[in-house]
Amino acid sequence: MELNRRDFMKANAAMAAAAAAGMTIPVKNVYAADDGIRWDKAPCRFCGTGCSVLVGTKDGRVVATQGDPDAEVNRGLNCIKGYFLSKIMYGADRVQTPLLRMKDGKFHKEGDFTPVSWDQAFTIMAEKVKDILKKKEPNSVGMFSSGQTTIFEGYAKVKLWKGGLRSNTIDPNARHCMASAAVAFMRTFGMDEPMGCYNDIEKTDAFVLWGSNMAEMHPILWSRISDRRLSDDKVKVVVMSTFEHRSFELADTPIIFKPHSDLAILNYIANYIIQNDKVNWDFVNKHTKFKRGETDIGYGLRPDHPRQKAAKNAKTAGKMYDSDFEEFKKIVEPYTLEKAHEISGVPKDQLETLAKMYADPKQTLVSFWTMGFNQHVRGVWVNHMVYNVHLLTGKISTPGCGPFSLTGQPSACGTAREVGTFVHRLPADMVVTNPKHVEIVEKAWKLPKGTIPTVPGYPAVMQSRMLKDGKLNFLWQLCTNNMQGGPNINEEIFPGWRNPENFIVVSDPYPSVSAVAADLILPTCMWVEKEGAYGNAERRTQFWRQQVKGPGESKSDLWQIVEFSKYFKTDEVWDEALLAQMPEYRGKTLYEVLYKNGQVDKFDTPTNIPGYINDEAEHFGYYLQKGLFEEYAAFGRGHGHDLADFDTYHQVRGLRWPVVDGKETLWRYREGFDPYVKAGEGVSFYGYPDKKAIILGVPYEEPAESPDEEYDLWLCTGRVLEHWHTGTMTRRVPELHRSFPNNLCWMHPDDAKARGLRHGDKVKLITRRGEIITHLDTRGRNKCPKGLIYTTFFDAGQLANKLTLDATDPISGETDYKKCAVKVVKA
């Protein structure tokens, strides 16, 4: 057998990409091992790529993980974090029993953490909730959850909070990372989530990355892009960012733009398409309609902030007005090549190269983006703008062409968005503000009419403000670390958590920054210590079975939610008007109403699977996960969100919804791929009754905060390959911690020299909100342009979010972690 040039190039591309991302090459014969290790599948615990791994267990512990060679997503590859998954659960400081702040044998806000039983923990939680509900509205009781929560857990949370306690104040940390993408999907297409799939990578001839360092944040997908680029000379890669990172190593067109100027660049591309007669009129006329967005909409700041007070249309930020092509043309017309260059600082030849790629009808192209796009005070707009250029050219919903929003968490799509753990959402793209949607959910859950409030609760940043202001008095945080990951910690988060009027609960496997700031810590099971399901960025739903038990008294979030529901009777949390509709519910617990309701509890636990463990099923006496999933999945079936039956997912490496007649959907809205598109329609954006997507005209507007004479640099925050989010898991893996032990500040050498600083110096980063001390890096992997510094938030010893501004997109409520003003001095 000969190895031809193409095979050689492909092999080298895969190896090079693997090496760059610290990946392991798959071992095919793991099942054949005779060392007593039992192997089973599970999706990776980290990012939203959705890699499948093989988990090896022995003597009740996870002892090894490998890339799953049978998985289509990662094809046996692991990134460096995935390689060390077996160690994330075994940090020496696992929390193994509930811990309550106590003094003199009673709860005290300033007391020491003292071990208590689960019954004691739930009793004081229930007392606090009931007391608040007697005095205040239900939205005064809140939950802050996560895009790492399993589908089963997320659904159980939504049922308890919205259907039981009648509070819509439940939001995920996905509000910080994916809310703008989700809102723009809903506004543009009438439905959430990408239309394409990862197969686009092998089908396209061009990749444009907007604010996405895929080489470090989605390394397995980057390995596939690298393979595609290095094995075909015609394939081109454009990488766009406010600083140079590892993804630039593969870029044919590397573009550094000024913070916030992506708005101007995208409007220039739209203008270029129009001025050069490259509009796909057949597609536009058949499949789109035009709208104009509200302008001068503010920055999601507190109402008394000067920038917020000056905004004319903050109260109508999300409004869209009927429009037409001519008005859209006028909106983008000012964004000439010269204007885009002036605003962005990007050389004109690079801007033209980019515009021509989008405009060329023969050029297949996929746009990828993540937090650089979404964490933006105009994040919804900029998402709309990238849809605009794909819709104007018809480069959408077809193999190798489309806009693709990548998620940063393993189930930001599957749980936060699809299940609906946001303050305004319900399952399957339904919302609490739509009375018809509420009626559908109440009927399915067998609840009295009017149980679910039709007013959204407090979203993520607003939760912190309301805790501080005393309007939100109970918060249960699960599977996230907002005291480290949220913005403006000193001014807006910490004060509310330590407000003596409030009671804060944190479910966490480790003593995170959030946990040690709470009043009660609940020990939670991790990853394969429970049965679970995730939904990744390409709409792929994946299941796994429990493979080991959690340590000590650790319990899964699912067990915690469902067990906690037993501590409430309907008479204690529902008013007489609701009880009068269904008197049979009087005296019943929320557990009986929501979970042991004849639907969730109707499936028996499997008895024919060797070595099967399911702690929740054993405790509650039925197959809780299956009951929750089948009740939840019924909302989407027949409505474009079809999921397969529960048992199927345990047999496969995931399926991309909608799954109809056992067949997954690769490209939505396109005839021949999507079962909801009728013969002869070609394309159908069926999320709207008229089956047309929206092209939205909006302008460039200034950021919330910019450098000035005192705070003379831009601050951008983000991550590194070795660590994930706040490092709660990865910093407890010795190999990952040693590889990148502490946060750094990356700066241009000339900026350092101008301040009398050198590489390695200890420096102080100072904003209007706070300061941290770190070390300077002028030579490392991230190369900043003059005027901008970059730092990360994984290091609990350097709380970078003391610095960040709590400005949000006014439409989505998503935080802008990428842009605020900072100064750097020697420490």
Swiss-Prot record:
The keyword Kinase does not apply. Its cofactor is [4Fe-4S] cluster; Mo-bis(molybdopterin guanine dinucleotide). InterPro entries: Asp_de-COase-like_dom_sf, CT_Nitrate-R-NapA-like, MoPterin_dinucl-bd_dom, Mopterin_OxRdtase, Mopterin_OxRdtase_4Fe-4S_dom, MopterinOxRdtase_cofactor_BS, Periplasm_NO3_reductase_lsu, Prok_molybdopt-oxidoreductase. One of its GO terms (cellular component) is periplasmic space. It is found in: Periplasm. GO terms for molecular function: 4 iron, 4 sulfur cluster binding; electron transfer activity; iron ion binding; molybdenum ion binding; molybdopterin cofactor binding; nitrate reductase (cytochrome) activity. Substrate binds at residue 793. Predicted to be exported by the Tat system. The position of the signal peptide cleavage has not been experimentally proven. Its EC number is 1.9.6.1. It comes from the Bacteria. One of its GO terms (biological process) is Mo-molybdopterin cofactor biosynthetic process. Residues 37-93 form the 4Fe-4S Mo/W bis-MGD-type domain. The keyword Electron transport applies. It catalyses: 2 Fe(II)-[cytochrome] + nitrate + 2 H(+) = 2 Fe(III)-[cytochrome] + nitrite + H2O. Its main location: periplasm. Keywords: 4Fe-4S, Electron transport, Iron, Iron-sulfur, Metal-binding, Molybdenum, Nitrate assimilation, Oxidoreductase, Periplasm, Signal, Transport. Binds 1 [4Fe-4S] cluster. Binds 1 molybdenum-bis(molybdopterin guanine dinucleotide) (Mo-bis-MGD) cofactor per subunit. [4Fe-4S] cluster binds at residues 44, 47, 51, 79. SMART domains: Molybdop_Fe4S4. Catalytic subunit of the periplasmic nitrate reductase complex NapAB. Receives electrons from NapB and catalyzes the reduction of nitrate to nitrite. Belongs to the prokaryotic molybdopterin-containing oxidoreductase family. NasA/NapA/NarB subfamily. Component of the periplasmic nitrate reductase NapAB complex composed of NapA and NapB. This is Periplasmic nitrate reductase. The lineage of its organism: Bacteria, Pseudomonadati, Pseudomonadota, Gammaproteobacteria, Pasteurellales. The gene is napA.
